[in-house]
């Protein structure tokens, strides 16, 4: 395994060299005549560097450790913006988030829809140079990579859940993909699959008691990420002649924490070390967490007043 700490300038210099080495047509300088390389781009939602290859020995991450052992492990990586959609938009387009909308989860909605004739994103660059580009799962912000109205916590006069946002089902990243989709299995739509529980259930935006985790006795394909992995394998088989740019986005470990029981049973909960706080506030019990984050408090548990988290909840 190679530990790699580089500056931002060095990263972009070497990324430019890598694009040229891949030989992607007219945008490559001195492109070699050999067969261009294929690209498998994997993104994982809300994954921290809490992996065995980053020194967390209690973590069971053999496949990621194997991948790290064959490549580079970055120790000095920073997101350009903390918001999920804005960060993905900045990464895929190379644009610095400077406007108000570019700092939000709706950053992709601000991208120009028309075809300008020039690549506006990384996958579009590959597509314009002869690559087949495919997006499976959550690569941009929306699950399945398309624009559709999202459920909210609001209800109308008839008690129906209100949805918001563009609903034209166009790809969030324009002119970038030959195919863009996300498997839904028993769930009604990609957004329901994103927050899916086993047997097709999904998070309720109007029920504060929706569980924050689940460990059902199901195979990998009993949850959306297993279906995404299966679809990605099928795409690899279909695209084997290349060249291709295949982007695969997994939902977990985004809330709710749902996975087949066999993965939960790999861990002895009492043996999981509690996280340290690098800059804890003074005179506050370390087991007390006060925040206004609706992901955990508003949508999954109802706290009427500040309470101490149990050790089990902290390990979760």
Q: Residue ranges of each PLM-predicted region?
A:
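Formylglycine-dependent sulfatase
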Residues: 2-316
């Amino acid at each position: 395994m190679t530990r790699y700490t580089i500056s931002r300038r060095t990263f972009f210099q070497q990324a430019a060299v890598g694009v040229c080495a891949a030989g992607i047509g007219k945008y490559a300088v001195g492109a070699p005549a050999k067969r261009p390389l294929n690209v498998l781009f994997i993104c994982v939602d809300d994954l921290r560097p809490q992996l065995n290859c980053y020194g967390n020995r209690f973590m069971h991450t053999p496949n990621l450790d194997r991948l790290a052992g064959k490549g580079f492990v970055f120790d000095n990586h920073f997101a350009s913006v903390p918001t999920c959609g804005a960060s993905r938009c900045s990464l895929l387009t190379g644009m610095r988030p400077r406007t108000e909308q570019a700092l939000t989860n709706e950053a992709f909605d601000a991208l120009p829809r028309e075809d300008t004739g020039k690549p506006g994103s990384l996958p579009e660059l590959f597509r314009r140079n002869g690559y087949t580009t495919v997006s499976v799962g959550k690569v941009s912000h929306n699950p399945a990579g398309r624009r559709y109205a999202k459920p909210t916590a609001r209800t109308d006069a008839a008690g129906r859940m209100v949805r918001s946002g563009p609903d034209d089902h166009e790809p969030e990243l324009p002119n970038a993909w030959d195919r863009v989709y996300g498997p839904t299995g028993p769930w009604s739509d990609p957004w329901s699959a994103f927050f899916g529980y086993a047997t097709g259930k999904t998070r309720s935006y109007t029920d504060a008691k929706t569980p924050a985790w689940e460990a059902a006795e199901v195979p990998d394909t009993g949850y959306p990420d297993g279906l995404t992995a299966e679809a990605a394998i099928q795409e690899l088989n279909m695209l084997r002649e290349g060249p291709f740019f295949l982007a695969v986005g997994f939902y977990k470990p985004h809330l709710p924490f749902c996975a087949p029981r066999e993965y939960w049973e790999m861990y002895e909960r009492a043996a999981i070390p509690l996280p340290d706080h690098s800059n804890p506030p003074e005179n506050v019990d370390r087991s007390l967490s006060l925040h206004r984050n609706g992901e955990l408090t508003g949508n999954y548990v109802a706290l009427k007043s500040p309470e101490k988290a149990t050790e089990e909840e902290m390990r979760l």
